[in-house]
Swiss-Prot record:
It holds the Pfam family DDE_3. Keywords: Plasmid, Transposable element. GO terms for molecular function: nucleic acid binding. It comes from the Bacteria. The keyword rRNA processing does not apply. NCBIfam families: transpos_IS630. This is Uncharacterized protein y4pE/y4sA.
Length: 135
């Protein structure tokens, strides 16, 4: 079995929405979009930056009305601020560990994500990009 962390952050507000799931496919992405949609403030709109993974671009996705998907060019993950979130989580909370079993992996993934979202200043620090705010 596998454990996948699906996560999105709002660097401006220091907020995050995430799920830990045993699969990485269209159904998982649909659950993630629903979670993000629920976390967007009333009257606000989120722009979700994505690579072009198959489960991101499938026409089967039903995107909530309060989310717009923005796709990066192929082979350019460095343009997505959330990649720095994954690197930070690996470097600080998830790498170089021995897990007892699958449940321990899921528990550590959930704990790492929850630790991140409990530190809004960390999300802001990792995710804000000067070029993203230029007019």
């Amino acid at each position: 079995m596998w454990a996948y962390i699906f996560g999105a952050v709002c660097p401006r507000k220091g907020k995050g929405a995430g799920l830990v799931l045993p699969y990485c496919d269209t159904e998982a992405m649909q659950e993630h979009l629903a979670e993000i949609g629920r976390s967007v403030d009333d009257g606000a709109h989120a722009v979700l930056i994505l690579d072009q993974a198959g489960w991101h671009v499938t026409p089967k996705l039903k995107v909530p009305d309060n989310i717009t998907l923005m796709f990066l060019p192929p082979r350019s993950p460095e343009l997505n601020p959330v990649e720095n979130v994954w690197q930070f989580m690996r470097d600080n909370w998830l790498s170089n560990r021995i897990f007892k079993d699958y449940d321990d992996i899921v528990t550590h993934c959930c704990a790492a994500w929850n630790k991140l979202v409990d530190q809004p200043w960390k999300i802001m620090s990792i995710g804000l990009r000067e070029w993203a705010h230029r007019s």
